[in-house]
Regions:
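Extended carbohydrate-recognition surfaces in non-catalytic/accessory domains of CAZymes
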Residues: 22-109, 162, 168-171, 183, ...
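Accessory beta-strand-rich segments of carbohydrate-active enzymes
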Residues: 32-35, 83-187, 212-214, 348, ...
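Extended substrate-binding grooves/exosites of carbohydrate-active enzymes
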Residues: 49, 53-56, 124, 129, ...
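Beta-strand-rich binding/interaction modules
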Residues: 119-121, 201-237, 246, 266, ...
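Short, hydrophobic beta-strand segments
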Residues: 140-142, 246-255, 653-659, 772-791
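Extended acidic/polar, glycine-enriched regions
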Residues: 145-147, 207-292, 655, 661-662, ...
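Beta-strand-rich structural segments
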Residues: 206-210, 267-269, 619-622, 668-669, ...
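Short flexible loop/turn segments that cap and initiate beta-strands
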Residues: 216-221, 259-265, 624, 630-637, ...
Length: 816
């Protein structure tokens, strides 16, 4: 009897296995061997950026150029234009991978490889790509042996003067392999889009394409599941046609938006008889998008102005190597500011970034190219455009079109061809490709030569005409635009260094200083740009502007304007947050305008000005209130009200004649009804006497700590997956607990237990200290230490030491 039962169970198990055999399987490939010269090899974890460890040196990609986009006519030495890190040159990755038995096809998927990847399998070239920012797929079935070990090799080549910013080097985004049986859904040919939706009902169209041994009659079940896994709609399609199309009707749908990023799961199951041939699942959101002259930009039928930022792909001290926790930190910090959209400037986004934007609620303008035929740098993408651009734009759209967060495609940024008929024809061609593979979203691009683009018809052909800067020309632009609206596709380019203030305070488009820093009074910008105040005036006074994307949400490696020719500047000053991810004063300026759920009252500058006693030291307040009263050591400096007629006083509260005296400044802010909404205070700090930690574990907390001021004990949990990160902001305090804003002590870091020291960053654009060495100076009193979990569970102990003052502090994190 026992023997018979075992036989029956074995048979049942075999039948179950048969019914599930050969359905797709996705395997991540994180462990590779890496070499720069093909001789010395080291094991690395992918994503990997071979250049981020440095050292910084002006010799790396030293460019003698005139940047036409900046209005330059004479060539000058640009020492930090692409980050001053060793990303140029060749690199090689290899791994041995055993292809499991029972499958018929294998496809390698690269989410991005910098750059010009050539992929070989078992010594034979299997495929190649040109653009380092694009995802691509290579069918390696003809080159592998199932059930045996196979050698996969990737050769990369980064050439000098091929980038205007830091691109990184290597397999900087994930690599995976997809395994299939006899028949499967073509992964990027599955397209889910909302046809119409309101609170009562939605219609969702699903398109799919079968590949492999098609032609046989079969059954495809398409189901829509809610977040709890409950089936809310289903359709069954039968027959031999490999092209599948159906519509799902959903009652009382949850609509996706930044405020409520609800995600459904689409599950496609292909049957051959009773056997499951393939299962494809993907997350999507139900939502509608529209743009029009009368209603502007609409999400789910509601008009809203885009409150966006531009983001480069690097993650500061982590370089280009993608990391989930770091991306979450970026997105959450922007959302807490009130930002609701990201422009992926100026290249294709990653899968991970888009998935996080879907789940966290961040709209996206997914960009493609920084140049077309005419180059902006000698060896840039223009070399590949004619051969590769159709493939690249097709990959972008087909790869990412199921992400509800993406609300428009961008086909270019400040393209030199915008003056010509040829440029207009290219623009229309690229836009048509976007429409071919995704008729549900509008297409835009950022134009910086408005007169040329309007004269050639370049601007008129776009679904959404996007203009970079020159906000004062919006009036003339709109007169020639049949669309009846425009987008501030790139705005502001205000420059500042966190915690640095310059006197006298001036409004300037060309201010520079011997120390290579910019003033955080937020009155300095570039020759082609403007202040945030100028953009907001246009948006508030005229409905024709459907929103903006500020340059930039974060500082990034490379492009150290206005210090392009000043060494050792090697990263940007444009960010609302600095390179370490710490908010500058400007963060609170945007928060006061964009975050409608919380009040903002932020006072600047700091109040440590030894040697300026009795000198005029202006005080600003960023607030959503309309009025404020400032006190210096308890004495009122008067109540100030925002003034719509003044460029700098419409969106700021300013006390321009305050004379410095040590002690305390305090501001109290009020709304239009005279009710108090907030206050902020700054104290003159004494000598540093103690250390403070503020901890961020982005994958485990709802809000970025640097905004809300987390304590040492807050959110100390990490995933024991070898990838999770904790960001610990370190600052020095005096004996009374006041932050020391001028402290520049060198700190050392030691990590023990179930984790490792990953990197450190202080936000100083002129610092040449390597990110990956366990010591760094404070900048404006702060720096950020990044700790990475291992795959071992247990305590992770970070110890930070200031030898100069004999101050030491530790914190224990937990990897679970």
């Amino acid at each position: 009897m026992i023997k018979r039962s075992i036989t029956f169970m074995t048979l049942a198990l075999a039948l179950t296995t048969l019914c599930q055999a050969q359905s797709r399987k996705i395997i991540n490939l994180p462990s590779w061997d890496f070499s720069r010269d093909g001789k010395a090899w080291q094991q690395v974890a992918v994503p990997h950026d071979w250049a981020i460890s440095g050292p910084f040196d002006k010799k790396w990609d030293l460019q003698m150029v005139a940047i036409e986009q900046n209005g330059e006519t004479e060539k000058t030495e640009k020492s930090g234009r692409s980050g001053a890190l060793p990303w140029i040159g060749e690199g090689m990755y290899k791994m041995n991978w055993t292809a499991p038995k029972g499958y018929k096809r294998a496809v390698l998927v690269f989410d991005g490889a910098m750059s010009q990847p050539v992929v070989s399998v078992n010594g034979k070239e299997a495929g190649r790509w040109a653009y380092g920012y694009n995802a691509f797929r290579i069918d390696i079935t003809p080159f592998i042996q199932f059930g045996k070990s196979n050698l996969i090799e990737v050769h990369l080549n980064n050439v000098e003067e091929s980038s205007r910013w830091y691109p990184g080097g290597g397999l900087y985004r994930p690599v995976s392999v997809e395994l299939y049986g006899n028949e499967n859904f073509s992964t990027w040919d599955t397209f889910v889009r909302t046809l119409k939706a309101d609170k009562q009902e939605a219609e969702v169209e699903v398109n799919a394409l079968l590949e492999g041994k098609t032609g046989k009659s079969g059954k495809t079940v398409i189901a829509l599941l809610d977040e709890a896994g409950k089936k809310v709609a289903e359709q069954i399609v039968t027959g031999a046609n490999p092209e599948i199309k159906t519509t799902l009707k959903v009652a009382n749908p949850q609509l996706w938006s930044p405020e409520s990023p609800y995600l459904y799961q689409v599950k496609l199951t292909r049957y051959e008889g009773k056997k499951v041939a393939d299962v494809q699942t993907l997350k999507t959101g139900i939502r509608t998008i529209a743009v029009s002259k009368n209603n502007g930009f609409q999400l789910n039928g509601i008009t809203r102005k885009l409150k966006g930022v531009c983001l480069h792909h690097d993650l500061g001290p982590l370089g280009a190597a993608e990391n989930k926790a770091a991306l979450i930190r970026q997105i959450k910090m922007m959302k807490q500011m009130g930002c609701d959209a990201i422009r992926t400037a100026h290249n294709m986004p990653s899968t991970m970034q888009m998935e996080l934007c879907d789940s966290l609620g961040m709209m996206v303008m997914a960009e493609s190219f920084d140049m077309w035929i005419y180059p902006k740098c000698k060896n840039g993408y223009a070399k590949f455009f004619k051969e590769w651009s159709d493939k690249d734009i097709t990959n972008l759209v087909k790869h990412h079109r199921n992400h509800p967060s993406i609300v428009m495609w961008s086909i270019g940024n400040e393209i030199p061809e915008q003056w010509s008929k040829e440029g207009m024809e290219i623009a229309k061609h690229l836009q048509d490709i976007c429409h071919q593979y995704d008729p549900s979203r509008p297409v835009t691009q950022g134009m910086d030569k408005a007169e040329d683009a309007l004269k050639s018809g370049f601007a008129q052909v776009m679904d959404v005409p996007g203009f970079n800067y020159r906000v004062h020309k919006y009036f003339k632009n709109i007169e020639q635009l049949p669309q009846g609206f425009l987008l501030g596709s790139e705005t502001a380019s205000t420059v500042s260094s966190r915690g640095v203030y310059k006197f006298p305070v001036v409004v300037s488009d060309k201010a520079t200083y011997p120390d290579g820093q910019c003033s955080s009074y937020d009155t300095e910008y570039c020759s082609w740009s403007n202040l945030p105040d100028d953009d907001w005036k246009m948006q508030d006074d005229y409905s024709l502007v459907i929103g903006e994307f500020v340059w930039t949400g974060y500082d990034y490696l490379g492009e150290p304007t206005p210090y392009d020719t000043y060494w050792p500047s090697r990263s940007s000053y444009f960010g609302i947050c600095d390179l370490a991810g710490l908010p500058k004063d400007r963060y609170y300026m945007y928060r006061a305008r964009w975050n409608e759920q919380q009040h903002t009252t932020h006072l600047l500058p700091h109040w440590n000005w030894k040697g300026r006693e009795g000198e005029v030291t202006p005080v600003y307040c960023y607030t959503d209130g309309v009025e404020g009263e400032l006190f210096v050591n308890g004495k009122s400096q008067g109540r100030v009200r925002k003034d719509k007629s003044s460029r700098l006083d419409r969106y700021r509260l300013r006390w321009n004649n305050v004379k410095y005296e040590p002690g305390e400044i305090r501001v109290v802010t009020y709304n239009q009804y005279g009710d108090k909404i907030g206050e902020d205070v700054k104290h003159t700090a004494g000598e540093p006497a103690q250390m403070k930690f503020s901890v961020e574990t982005p994958d485990h907390e709802p809000i970025a700590c640097m905004v809300e001021g987390c304590t040492d004990e807050h959110n100390v949990i990490l995933n024991a997956d070898g990838n999770d990160l904790a960001f610990i902001t370190v600052s020095l305090l005096d004996k009374d607990g006041n932050e020391c804003p001028l402290a520049d002590d060198e700190l050392t870091f030691e990590v023990s237990g179930a984790g490792t020291f990953k990197a450190a960053c202080n936000g100083d654009a002129t610092s040449l200290e390597p990110f990956t060495q366990p010591q760094m100076k404070l900048f404006s009193g702060k720096l950020v230490v990044i700790v990475q979990s291992s795959k071992q569970k247990g305590d992770i102990i970070l110890k930070v030491k200031d030898s100069k003052r004999n101050i030491e502090k530790s914190i224990t994190l937990q990897a679970i």
